[in-house]
Regions:
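The conserved SAM/SAH-binding core of class I Rossmann-like methyltransferase domains
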Residues: 2-4, 51, 87, 120
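Oxidoreductase cofactor-interface core, primarily capturing Rossmann-like NAD(P)-dependent enzymes
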Residues: 4-9, 14, 35, 56, ...
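NAD(P)H-binding glycine-rich loop region in Rossmannoid oxidoreductase-like domains
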Residues: 7-71, 75-78
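Short, amphipathic alpha-helical "lid/cap" segments that border enzyme active or binding sites
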Residues: 39, 73, 155-163, 245-253
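A general structural signal for well-ordered alpha-helical segments in protein cores
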Residues: 45, 69, 103, 132, ...
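Conserved catalytic-site loops of classical short-chain dehydrogenases/reductases
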Residues: 46-49, 82-86, 118
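Terminal hydrophobic/aromatic helix or amphipathic segment near a protein terminus
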Residues: 186-237
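Amphipathic terminal alpha-helices
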Residues: 232-259
Length: 259
């Protein structure tokens, strides 16, 4: 496993995400943007999986989501890996955010590479939906379009899906999501019910987005791009093939005490 911080990887993560302690045969600790570190990452690996990407870090998505993944792909090709599985994002080619442009650029490069390419596009993650539960704790959830649909997936279910695809060894691209499809209104009410609050859902007018994103970009282009990515997904259906056995309502119930 290639990580920046082994100690962090061996601790339980947010929302009870599991530690990797005792599960990794060999650690590679370093900076994936450094060519000397990346060139031999895939040495001895029969298959490569990359979920590498910018989340809340201050790094440039183009450097990480595209170029660093290309360096890992080059290592996989150099050392003869049989397949390369990439965790992308559903709808990335249509989303205007810099983050998704970087992901799309790498996904296209992977498809052209001389390796069995497997591109997995999750709709959203349960962990992403904790922001809705935090709003629900305050008694009201604010959304844009109540009819837009999504089916978030638990990270463990996504991992099972990826392992199944690796075992099959087929080349392709798959849009995946969890077993439950929600409208945003239904998701908001699920969060409010988990927090034992009255079903108070407010609608944010979409006309506010251009000036709000423009104002945010004056102070932080990174935050503006993250907001552009998040709001785009809230305004477009993000529904993948139903996968897994874990349900968001149960996840909310298990983690309500952590918000």
């Amino acid at each position: 496993a290639a990580v920046r911080d082994r100690a962090r990887a061996e601790k339980e993560g947010p929302w009870k995400s599991p530690s990797l302690e005792g599960l990794v045969e060999e650690w590679a600790v370093g900076d994936v943007t450094e060519p000397d570190f990346a060139k031999d990452l895939a040495k001895g690996a029969a298959q490569v999986v990359s979920a590498l990407g910018v989340t809340r870090q201050k790094a440039d998505p183009w450097q990480i989501d595209n170029l660093a993944n290309r360096a890992i792909l080059a290592s996989a090709l150099r050392h003869g890996a049989a397949s390369f599985t990439y965790v992308n994002v559903l709808g990335g080619e249509a989303c205007p955010a810099k983050l998704t442009r970087a992901k799309t650029a790498f996904a296209r490069a992977l498809k052209r590479a001389g390796v069995v390419s497997q591109i997995v596009n999750p709709s959203a993650y349960f962990s992403d939906m904790m922001s809705v539960l935090k709003m629900a704790k305050r008694g009201k959830v604010h959304i844009f379009d109540p009819a837009i649909r999504l089916n978030p997936i638990h990270g463990a279910d996504l991992a099972v899906c990826i392992c199944d695809l690796m075992e099959k060894g087929e080349k392709g691209s798959w849009d995946v999501g969890g077993p439950d499809v929600f409208t945003w209104d239904e998701l908001a009410r699920t969060a409010l019910a988990a927090m034992e609050k009255q079903p108070r859902v407010g609608k944010i007018p979409t006309w506010i987005l251009p000036p709000a994103l423009g104002l945010t970009s004056l102070f932080s282009r990174r935050l503006a791009d993250a907001a552009r990515f998040a709001t785009w997904n809230m305004l477009h259906d993000c529904v993948g093939s139903a996968t897994g056995v874990r349900h968001l309502a149960d996840f909310y119930a298990e983690n309500r005490g952590l918000v």
